A protein has these predicted regions:
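Amphipathic alpha-helical packing segments from all-alpha helical-bundle domains
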Residues: 71, 99-102, 115-151, 177, ...
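Solvent-exposed, amphipathic alpha-helical segments
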Residues: 15, 19-26, 72-77, 106, ...
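N-terminal intrinsically disordered/low-complexity leader segments
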Residues: 1-11, 194-196
Length: 196
């Protein structure tokens, strides 16, 4: 029997996860059948089961994979200097809503479903770890302790995702205004404390 090229298999699996996730994002979790998924991938229904044990397995793996890519996309825009914070706060919620709004809606549809809630808890535990690590990385650049930065990041992300889900301008603007003020005041406070 011929051995499987594992790298090619994983590349194809990643393509399938993206195609299926995008199909679900366009049509909804309950509005998408296995035939629609197969069509989106250019495969037969049976071929999907070469890559995933069950439809639930496909849903869970594709959600985790695609949302980690969304998170990477988001973090590539993250500020690395104090001068970049205001731009980030002003621009990124609109960018993420336009680029990833449907994906966020699907993610919440999946991860709040009773069948998948434990997968959601694990995914968000990882998100918490990654954002906390980012805060530790940014502490020396921004001059704000990571224990203070981490909750600010969580507030920003929650408001940006809420906007991506519902496009609620008032909710976004009110939280971003408080966040900008907080960052400004905290930056001044910690700069002052750091002076001899």
């Amino acid at each position: 029997m011929r051995e499987r090229d594992e790298q090619a298999f994983q590349r194809k699996k990643a393509e399938i996860m993206e195609a299926c996730f995008n199909c679900y994002a366009e049509n909804g979790l309950t509005g998408t059948g296995i035939q629609a998924l197969a069509d989106a991938c250019g495969l037969s229904k049976a071929s999907l089961y070469t890559y995933f044990d069950t439809l639930d397995d496909l849903i869970v793996q594709s959600t985790a994979y695609c949302m980690s890519k969304v998170e990477d996309d988001f973090m590539r825009l993250a500020p690395i200097s104090p001068q970049d914070i205001q731009r980030f706060i002003d621009e990124v919620p609109y960018w993420t809503a336009k680029r990833h709004g449907k994906k966020y809606r699907l993610m919440y549809q999946v991860y709040t479903h009773p069948k998948y809630i434990e997968h959601g808890k694990r995914f968000f535990a990882g998100v918490t770890e990654r954002y906390s690590a980012y805060a530790r990385q940014m502490e020396p650049h921004l001059g704000i302790p990571c224990e203070v930065l981490t909750p600010l990041i969580f507030i920003f992300v929650r408001a940006a995702v809420h906007y991506a889900l519902f496009e609620d301008e008032y909710y976004l603007k009110s939280q971003m205004d408080v966040l900008k003020l907080s960052v400004s005041l905290l930056s001044k406070q910690y700069r002052k404390e750091g002076q001899p």
